[in-house]
A protein has these predicted regions:
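A polyanion-binding, active-site-adjacent surface
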Residues: 2-259
């Protein structure tokens, strides 16, 4: 694949060095992860105040037929699992609701819980760099250049621990409805809990990446979560390969993907 100046700049920002092959042969770009500083450990979160913790209750009914405003309200008011007692706020999702691309992550971290938006902080900066290298963004843009970003869980697990099965089960209908409303042409599943929810697979990400899966007829590409890549920068080049696979898959469906 030939890189343009924008893509080279973004790859460098991701920490991936790119070399062109010698002129006498076919032109091939080889990406190699550059050394990166280890991500700082997140600061411990303050324990929630029992006086303000909401009482547990059933998940809102009728999720499968909700429109965007109703779905957002349902997520904000959900008390169906124990995570409701420790959240600052829910993290619904962000982006153009008609975006051609959808990114599905795992669970909010401390900064996401505080700001109410998925993928912020260093992992969000890395994700934005990855998306910009594909000509995509989470800000204002036409749907073909936009992504809608959501997490599998809408509330932060305490101490950034892994989600538990019942928590994933309670949040899953919200994610399913988000996908139904967006109607994306491509889904990027980032991390094993996104994979578990969308593909019903317990296989590790490393075994599922590198191929195109299907979710309800929508092409889905598995890749590493940006937080994982910050801890394991040697896998950034593999993540870039996954993004290129998704982009190639999109080209026949969306001419703008080749622009």
């Amino acid at each position: 694949m030939r890189w343009n100046e924008r893509q080279v700049a973004m790859l460098q920002e991701m920490g991936i060095r790119v070399w062109d092959a010698p002129a006498q042969g076919d032109e091939v770009a080889v990406a190699e992860p550059a050394p990166a500083a280890a991500a700082p450990e997140p600061a411990p979160a303050a324990a929630p105040s029992p006086a303000t913790a909401p009482l547990r209750g059933p998940r809102p009914s009728g999720v499968a037929t909700m429109d965007w405003p109703a779905l957002r309200d349902a997520v904000a008011g959900c008390t169906a699992c124990k995570l409701c007692s420790g959240r600052t706020q829910t993290v619904f999702g962000v982006g153009n609701p008609q975006a051609h691309w959808m990114v599905v992550g795992e669970a909010p971290g401390e900064q996401e819980d505080r700001q109410g938006e998925p993928f912020v902080g260093k992992s969000g900066q890395l994700l934005d760099s990855m998306l910009r290298a594909l000509g995509l963004r989470r800000g204002e843009a036409e749907p073909a250049r936009q992504v809608f970003i959501a997490n599998t869980l809408k509330c932060r697990p305490p101490g950034n621990r892994n989600p538990e099965p019942d928590e994933l089960a309670q949040c899953e209908p919200f994610l399913i409805r988000q996908i139904e409303l967006v109607k994306p042409r491509m889904i990027l599943a980032m991390g094993r809990f996104a994979v578990q929810s969308l593909l019903r697979s317990s296989e590790p990400v490393g075994r599922l990446r590198g191929k195109v899966h299907q979710y309800q007829g929508v092409p889905l590409v598995v890749t590493y979560h940006p937080a994982y890549l910050l801890r394991n920068p040697e896998d950034k080049a593999r993540a870039w390969d996954d993004l290129c696979l998704a982009l190639e898959q999109m080209k026949p469906m969306d001419p703008a993907a080749d622009a």
